[in-house]
Amino acid sequence: SMIGILGEDCSRIDIHFTEVRKMDNKEYEIKGASRTRLTLICLLKGNIYIDSISSCSQMMKSECMEVDGFIYGHYSFAEYGDKRYSGVFSGFFKQGYRVNGQQIEKGRNEMAELRLNLAEYRGNWRSANGLIKICSWADEVIPDTPVNFCLFNDAGE
């Protein structure tokens, strides 16, 4: 699961991918769910598209032994369910990866103290009635938070 923010008011959002299916070398189908305000849950389905792949420097590999590089691309995920609360997420992502034999796997950060994002999504959410909100989520540190935003929000969201 990843945690993030939605809208100018920085409402909490949680994103969880339940299924990933390779369509071809550049496209993957994603299924999962979003949760806002801790109670509103919408199932989602969409795609990620790979735009580029990079390798980590030797220095980065020594700090994060479970990361060989990053995959960069764009995404579009449509929520389905109650039309009042569903919409479409779209934007850009990065995902850390590692090579394990002949397999490419999701990267892992074994040193949580580094607070390094291995998965990061930035973009917009568009509601069924056309309302657009900025959104971002990640596996560690929420990207694009306002300067005065507290990462450990006690507001109950």
Which role fits each region the language model picked out?
Residues S1-E157:
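Central antiparallel beta-sheet cores of small beta-barrel/beta-sandwich binding domains
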